[in-house]
Every structure is written in C-alpha cells, then in structure tokens.
Amino acid sequence: MPMGAAERGAGPQSSAAPWAGSEKAAKRGPSKSWYPRAAASDVTCPTGGDGADPKPGPFGGGLALGPAPRGTMNNNFCRALVDRRPLGPPSCMQLGVMPPPRQAPLPPAEPLGNVPFLLYPGPAEPPYYDAYAGVFPYVPFPGAFGVYEYPFEPAFIQKRNERERQRVKCVNEGYARLRGHLPGALAEKRLSKVETLRAAIRYIKYLQELLSSAPDGSTPPASRGLPGTGPCPAPPATPRPDRPGDGEARAPSSLVPESSESSCFSPSPFLESEESWH
C-alpha cells in the first residue's frame, strides 16, 4: 500500500526519536553539579569483560560504572562499596596508623656468680654434726651448726668480724696482764674489768706514796697501808737500786685485802669519788 509523503517522513522520524535522546544524553555526560571530583586514592573497579575504559561515576572519577540495564545496579559498583567499607569498628583507625611500639626488652639478669650466697642452717643434732665434721673439714663450726664462721658471706663482712675478734682478744689479753701485776690475792681472784682497773689504780697510788714518803731510804709511815688493812708493819729497809727500773716495790701478800671493794686508801679526791660509787 503506497504511503504518503507525510507518513514516509513521520515513520523514520518516529522510530529514531527514542534513540536520539539517549545519544544526546551520552554526549552530554554526567552533570558536574553533584558529582565529586575524583581523588588519586579512589578505588577503581574494572568494567565488564569488554575491556572498555572506566567511566566516571557518582562516587568519583576513579569509580567505574560499567554498562548495565536500566533500573539495575552494577555488580562492580557493589564490589567497590564493599572494598571501601572499613573492616574494624568505627572507633578504630586503620588507615595510616602505625602499630604500637613494642616494649623494650628487660635488661638481662645479673649472673648468679656475682650474687653472694648466704647460708644459715639451723641447729643440728650431735650425730649430724659429727657426720658433717668429716665432710666439711675446712668450715670451723663453733657449735652444733649454730652460727657459721661466715664462710659464704661477702669479704667485707668477714674482714669486719675478724677485726672485731682481734680487738676483743687484745683487750682480754691486756686485762690478763694487768691482773698479773696486782698483788697475789688480787691476781688469783677472778675480777671483772671494772674491778681490775680500780684495784690497779689503788695499787699504783700505794706505790707512789711508798716512794714519796721515804726518799732517803727511811721507813714509810706505819699508819698507811693497802686498802682494807690496819697499820702495816714497816718493811725491812732495803737499799734502793741505782736505776728506778732495776727493782719493783711490791707489797707483801699478807697486806693485800680479801675484797677489792673495801678500801681505806690515800685521801686522793679521785679515789674518794670512786669509793662513793658503791
């Protein structure tokens, strides 16, 4: 059936009209009013298998949207959103955050060789002490494992204890020698250190008075004697030695008092103050 000119002109125009609008929209491209500018770090998603270049999408220039049917969502677009979603909770920062620094390792422990080894065993029974005496002959045990002679203590403690033992030993030896110079009864009696010093002071005073009262060899006065005695008889006159160190004046043992506490010594204020202590 022949068609009119109007119909021939309208037919192709009506069939091409729908495609004309889509071509104009494709040439116009996306509107720049609401699309953000693409950043260099935006996630890009490859298009479909056709290998076409990615096209700018609504989430940046790097986000590609492949051709998809109208009214549907592109799978690549969904995958890009999943890749951009943070893996941790919102309160955590995962991008650009360095891991916390590791704690510095602890300094190495001091070797056991530098640590002093202190051993203080308790008291042991005599059978155990006899058994260990043969095993440890180099350890001087003062008693049944009472207190060690510090074989395992530091050197400065051992030296300090040794000095203290030497000091006590010297003091005891000095008092023993002083008791030996006292008259017989006092030398044989067990005296304390204070009693030994007081008896030595009284004896020295007696010797000084004995020498000062008879400078020319005459007899000393009979009214004075050693403490605790009455008037002492005059000792036999003996010639004085040429040198004062050649002889030693000693009182007879019968004149020595029985007790060192009782004294009727010379009226020295020093001795009177000592006697007032009792």
From Swiss-Prot:
Residues 230-239 have a biased composition (Pro residues). The keyword Transcription applies. One of its GO terms (biological process) is regulation of transcription by RNA polymerase II. It holds the Pfam family HLH. Residues 155-207 form the bHLH domain. Keywords: DNA-binding, Nucleus, Transcription, Transcription regulation. The keyword Transcription applies. Interacts with transcription factor TCF3/E12. This is Achaete-scute homolog 5.
